Amino acid sequence: MQIQWYPGHMTKARRAMQEDLKLVDLVMELTDARAPLAGRNPDIDKLAAGKARMIFLKKADLADDQATLAWMDYFRKKGITPIRLDARKTNFKKAVVDGVKIACQEKIERDRRKGILNRPIRAMVVGIPNVGKSTFINSLAGKTAAKTGNKPGVTRGNQWIKIDKQLELLDTPGILWPKFDDEAIGMKLACVGSISDEVLNMQEIAYHLLSYGKANYNQLFEARYGAVPQPDDERDNEIVLWMENIARQRGCLKRGAETDFDKVSAQITDDFRSGRIGKVSLEVPKQV
């Protein structure tokens, strides 16, 4: 799947980010826990060199718990403080503030030695489009502090948001690279919904999810969709046959009982994104 989604304002955002980084102590990066590496901009490590770092694994309640633990260890070894974000937990703000203290411990101690007490940490929130940066800030601020939306790239200008006496955030639009050199990265982002569905082939996404699920989470996928059919003819594709079975189960049929692949593909993709299949991660450190 060749995907290129890079609006002009993103180029400006990258330049602005380089300038804004001079103002902050901490870079707070958001990524989807189901595809943490695919959901990171490859330039961030270079741009944020010398800054304290945090990474928030969003939607961790939808990801494989063991994979998430492995990712947290992976990022710790890189000097990045990882925080697992679970939509079901209510202590969100405390988890973030506690994590900031850990990530910025050196700066806080350095300020204390200079006699500077309680100076707020200034942080920048970064991430690819549609990862939920504005919602993240709103949850911290306890009010609608930044414009939010459910489509990639809705946030535009930069805003300073005062969270409390100890933390101020700069909401910066996410940056997605101009093209995906590795098609697998684009597919993972498409699966988790980080790219606008309008530019995607939903049948490819559903096919990939079923193929990946069969290989890595067969029990979960078969519990949801029934057993993978065994082709009578070696020329038949078992994943396509599986999609046809699912379509019949769900009533995703056109006139003449023909399979409506678009409709069933949308349902399979939505099942994954909403967690109805179960806890599934699309990559783990050993795979990348």
Which residues does each PLM region occupy?
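Helix-rich effector regions associated with P-loop NTPase G domains
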Residues: 1-26, 34-43, 47-53, 60, ...
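Alpha-helical scaffold segments in soluble metabolic enzymes
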Residues: 95, 99, 135, 208, ...
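Canonical P-loop GTPase G-domain recognition
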Residues: 52-54, 60-126, 145, 252-253, ...
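Conserved active-site beta-strand-loop modules that form the wall/rim of enzyme catalytic pockets
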Residues: 87, 137, 167-170
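Short phosphate-engaging motifs
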Residues: 92, 132, 168
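Solvent-exposed alpha-helices and their adjacent loops that cap or buttress functional pockets
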Residues: 116-118, 140, 161-162
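Glycine-rich phosphate-binding P-loop
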Residues: 122-142, 146, 172
